[in-house]
Every structure is written in C-alpha cells, then in structure tokens.
Amino acid sequence: MADQSLSTEEYPTEIHEYLMAFENSVGSVDEMLKKMMSVSRSELLQKIEPLEQAKLDLVSAYTLNSLFWIYLTTQGINPKEHPVKEELERIRGYMNRVKEITDRKKAARLDKGAARRFIKHALCDPTSEEAPPAKMDCKAKKKRK
C-alpha cells in the first residue's frame, strides 16, 4: 500500500485482509495491462480474425470502464448514477451480440446433399405394393419403372 506506516492495530484485521486482496488484484490487473500494452495494437490485430478483434476491443473497453467504475467508488462517487454505468451496459450489449454470432458459427450446419441422400434412402420402401422383390435396391426399382 502507499502508506506502510499504518499498523494493522489502527484498523480492524478484516479490513486489512480486504485491502491486501485488493492490492493483489490491482497488481494482477497491472501485470495483464503491461503484457497487453507491450505488443503494438496493429501487430496484434494483424494476427487475429475480425471476430477475435471485436472480442479484444470489447474486453479492453469493458476492462477500462470497470477500472473507472472502481476509481469512482474509491472517490466516494456512486458509479450507478454516473454515465459509466450506461457505457458498461452498452458494451455488454455488444458482447452479447458477438456471443450470438460466435454461437451461430459453432451451431450445427445442415449438409443439404447429405440430408437429401438420407431422405431419399429412408423413403425408399421396397415393401410397398409396387415393390420389386426384397433383394432389389431402390436404384433397381427406379430402372424397372
């Protein structure tokens, strides 16, 4: 912390534990931001696909606004009444849209050719009234007609 001269006896132990956890979290965020800032943005964007670029931009914007939310809280300002709340909601909306697009890409796709063959062979019924002998397949049945 900034002022190490305060002893833990001057404030409750619970607060000290929370402050230490907060300090560790801020340190982790700082390390991540340093890693992210060490690579140039244009270099990074060249290596990833457009959808991944959108995800990166959204996560960056969300992280920055979340940090600002924390800053406002530490300054005694209610962030729920600040425009940052609307910005976070807007970013969440875009994140949901990107998630929908990602889910659509991952969804099973219909192979029309395979479906057509499957239906064609499933509908071939050699036991119908006009059916050829049981050992004949559907192709032979078509040739007979």
UniProtKB/Swiss-Prot annotation:
BP GO annotations: maturation of 5.8S rRNA; regulation of gene expression
Residue intervals passing through the bilayer: none
Localization in the cell: Nucleus; Cytoplasm; Nucleus, Nucleolus
Domain of life: Eukaryota
Keywords tagged on the record: Coiled coil, Cytoplasm, DNA-binding, Exosome, Nucleus, RNA-binding, rRNA processing
One Gene Ontology MF term: DNA binding
InterPro entries: Exosome-assoc_fac/DNA_repair (IPR011082), Sas10/Utp3/C1D (IPR007146)
GO cellular component, one term: exosome (RNase complex)
Role, per record: Plays a role in the recruitment of the exosome to pre-rRNA to mediate the 3'-5' end processing of the 5.8S rRNA.
Subunit and partners: Monomer and homodimer. Associates with the RNA exosome complex.
Protein name, as recorded: Nuclear nucleic acid-binding protein C1D
Annotated source species: Xenopus laevis
Gene that this sequence comes from: c1d
